[in-house]
């Protein structure tokens, strides 16, 4: 019997008590929560619904932060580059930074915890040659070397929590005191925070789920002097520091800390940077220490008979759900924001929790819910995009956040979400507890491996960037594809030379010398031979962009013999190239009419003589294939996410694995329609991913087929 209620969480506030009850009934919600900027109405305590309470571990206690300024959370900042044109150089530290957000830390020994670097030579400037003038806010360097560039790396206190500041700016909150971020890792604040949590639980006995936001360090988010976002890294660790923590780190690793281990020439160790040993050591240290303290808080929540839920975002740095330390924390649940399929897999794939919940978009904020806004459109795109991923890796609950009052002003939106809630319940009932049919085992190979599973090519959460959408499309396509997907690192291969035998196809996607492509790892003899042996013995390798690319021993693409292509960087202009004939009548392109969208593509890619070019534009190869021993290689210049490109990737995986004969199993001839089978449950579904009706032929697991007409966005369930 189809469930009409449950698995849905809605927001509430003091001014929408009756409306909350109405929406609970209409959407079939069984849980209510508060949000940043709202309060939970006491009148709703006894509705029978599960009650979530958002709990901020690092803010909303300014009295404590002001009384203990030495334990305010800190972050590392690097000044801009300055060229010396005289014998003295002054660098103003707060240039182009929001003055109310950060405060320079002069309390701790700046000669140890700051660093002035000559960026022309890479040398550290001795502390005897610079000082900080508190009156001007400048670091004064003298003597300097003329026309050398210098930077200053320094510590600053976070005087306005970046998330609170963002919410205040977006919602135009007036007369709101900036919330100071305090450092829960430090001794006084640690003791206070544990006691503060107990007080909260004592006074909120009606709460069923404590929704931690989060444990305990904010991802890197900095605003400029105009309150605009200046720098963001959703995975950034630079705001997880303090001398107290760094001294512990030094003791554990046995070598002195340098600010440069975090600053990384100004790149702040973003996910495109190949991580240094020191930064990986720091991350491992942070994971262990954050997990220990998070477990203490979770244990307290359990002591009170309540569930502990973590919001995956905001102050989440160090939690790393795909790493071993996470399991020790004992969380009951994880909730994450759903921006697309890949962001859903970021938390739906998490193990060692009882359930996961997706907070869907749009958030009920005025940036969407205003006159002329179209929240229904945003909701449809969000749901249909995420649904592909849910069908591969189901979450157990869905929910929404923000100001319910705003959503109620859009009755069409209310009606659409009612339909989504019911569709989700039906979907969950049909697929719970079962691994969907997977046609092949695919490994995405990069420097980060499982720690950044599904986070490849993500700078800020689900935000488009012109420079990476052509690569992120691969990850998004995989999030809803019928493959068993793993994320592995080069270090994993070094640790286990037989690792690749577990997979049918390996994918390497990204620009040269980034962490996604691999850089110098590709000149490591163990790695290059392991990958070539894997393909030679029958495996598939798909390279996208500048795969396996690093200039070495006469090659830029180190797997040119596998992929059949090389990039012209000027060094091969003397060699004539004659292989330009296209062969579009290929298995990979069988569903494509017209051109393939390669996004930004790649310039100056040419094919080796024995390579089969599928598509080239103006003598620049965009897609090519090649055999290598018993295996096969596929090169693609870029592949933005679309339903058609998802089909191209699907066929590329099958072809590279020499599995063309497995195409017509749980398959739709129309690439706008997909089939997902749950063999152990004896069910399968056919889903229309578009906003238009579609016709297709559906193939079942035994190869039999039937024609099908589908309405817009429709999902149909069948017994096997």
Model-derived segments and spans:
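Boundary/entry segment of secreted carbohydrate-active catalytic domains
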Residues: 1-20, 26-30, 159-160, 164-175, ...
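The substrate-binding groove and active-site-proximal loops of carbohydrate-active enzymes
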Residues: 6-12, 29-35, 100, 171-191, ...
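Catalytic domains of carbohydrate-active enzymes, especially glycoside hydrolases
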Residues: 9, 15-52, 196-213, 326, ...
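Hydrophobic targeting/anchoring helices
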Residues: 44, 64-65, 197-198, 208-215, ...
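Polysaccharide-binding and catalytic clefts of secreted carbohydrate-active enzymes
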Residues: 70-328, 346, 432
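Extracellular ligand-binding/catalytic regions of CAZymes and related secreted enzymes
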Residues: 221-224, 405-438, 479, 558, ...
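Short helix-loop-beta junction
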Residues: 462-487
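A glycine-rich, often tryptophan-bearing local segment used as a flexible ligand/cofactor-contacting loop or short
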Residues: 518-594, 599
């Amino acid at each position: 019997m189809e469930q009409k209620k449950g698995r849905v969480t809605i927001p509430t506030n003091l001014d929408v008590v009756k409306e909350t009850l109405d929406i609970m009934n209409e959407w079939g919600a069984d849980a209510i929560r508060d949000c940043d900027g709202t309060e939970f109405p006491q009148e709703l305590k006894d509705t029978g619904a599960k009650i979530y309470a958002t709990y901020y571990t690092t803010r909303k206690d300014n009295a404590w932060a002001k009384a203990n300024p030495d334990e305010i959370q800190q972050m590392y900042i690097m000044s801009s580059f300055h060229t010396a044109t005289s014998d003295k150089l002054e660098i103003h530290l707060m240039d182009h930074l929001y003055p109310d957000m950060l405060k320079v830390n002069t309390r701790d020994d700046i000669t140890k915890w700051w660093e002035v670097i000559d960026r022309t030579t890479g040398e550290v400037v001795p502390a005897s040659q610079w000082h900080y003038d508190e009156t001007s806010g400048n670091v004064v360097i003298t003597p300097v070397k003329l026309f050398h560039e210098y930077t200053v790396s320094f510590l600053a206190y976070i005087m306005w929590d970046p998330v609170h500041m963002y919410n205040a700016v977006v919602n135009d909150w007036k007369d709101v005191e900036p919330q100071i971020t305090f450092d829960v890792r430090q001794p006084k604040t640690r003791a206070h925070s544990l006691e503060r949590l107990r007080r909260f639980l004592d006074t909120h006995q009606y709460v069923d789920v404590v929704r931690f936001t989060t444990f305990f360090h904010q991802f890197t988010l900095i605003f400029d002097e105009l309150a605009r976002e200046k720098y963001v890294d959703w995975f950034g660790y630079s705001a997880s520091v303090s001398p107290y923590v760094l001294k512990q780190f030094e003791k554990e690793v046995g070598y002195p800390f340098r600010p440069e281990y975090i600053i990384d020439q100004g790149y702040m160790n973003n996910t495109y940077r190949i991580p240094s040993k020191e930064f990986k050591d720091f991350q491992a240290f942070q994971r262990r220490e954050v997990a220990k303290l998070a477990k203490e808080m979770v244990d307290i929540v359990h002591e009170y008979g309540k569930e502990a839920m973590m919001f995956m975002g905001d102050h989440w740095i160090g939690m790393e759900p795909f790493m071993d330390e996470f399991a020790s924390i004992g969380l009951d649940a994880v909730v994450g924001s759903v921006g697309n399929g890949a962001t859903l897999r970021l938390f739906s794939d998490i193990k060692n929790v009882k359930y996961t919940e997706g907070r869907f978009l749009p958030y009920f904020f005025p940036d969407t819910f205003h006159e002329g806004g179209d929240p229904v459109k945003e909701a449809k795109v969000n749901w249909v995009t995420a649904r592909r991923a849910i069908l591969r890796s189901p979450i157990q609950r869905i929910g929404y956040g923000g100001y319910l009052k705003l959503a109620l002003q859009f009755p069409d939106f209310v009606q659409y979400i009612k339909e989504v809630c019911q569709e989700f319940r039906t979907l969950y009932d049909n697929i719970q507890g079962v691994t969907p049919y997977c046609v092949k085992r695919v490994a995405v190979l990069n420097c980060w491996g499982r720690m950044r599973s599904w986070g490849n090519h993500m700078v800020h959460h689900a935000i488009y960037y012109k420079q990476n959408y052509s690569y992120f499309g691969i990850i998004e396509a995989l999030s809803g594809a019928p493959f068993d997907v793993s994320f592995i690192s080069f270090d994993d291969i070094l640790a286990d030379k037989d690792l690749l035998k577990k997979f049918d196809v390996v994918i390497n996607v990204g620009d040269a010398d980034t962490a996604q492509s691999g850089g110098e790892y590709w000149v490591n003899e163990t790695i290059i031979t392991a990958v070539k042996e894997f393909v030679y013995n029958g495996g598939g390798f798909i390279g996208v962009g500048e795969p396996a690319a690093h200039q070495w021993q006469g090659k830029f693409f180190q797997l040119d013999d596998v992929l059949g292509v090389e990039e012209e960087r000027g060094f091969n202009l003397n060699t004539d190239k004659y292989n330009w004939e296209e062969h579009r009548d290929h298995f990979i392109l069988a569903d494509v009419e017209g051109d393939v969208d390669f996004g930004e593509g790649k310039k100056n890619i040419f094919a080796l003589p024995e390579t089969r070019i599928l598509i080239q534009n103006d003598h620049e190869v965009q897609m090519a294939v090649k055999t290598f021993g018993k295996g096969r290689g596929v090169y693609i210049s870029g592949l933005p996410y679309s339903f058609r490109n998802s089909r191209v990737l699907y066929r590329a995986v099958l072809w590279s694995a020499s599995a063309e004969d497995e195409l017509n199993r749980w398959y739709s001839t129309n690439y706008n329609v997909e089939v997902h089978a749950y063999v152990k449950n004896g069910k399968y579904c056919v889903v229309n991913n578009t906003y238009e009706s579609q016709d297709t032929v559906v193939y079942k697991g035994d190869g039999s087929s039937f024609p099908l007409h589908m309405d817009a966005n429709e999902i149909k369930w069948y017994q096997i």
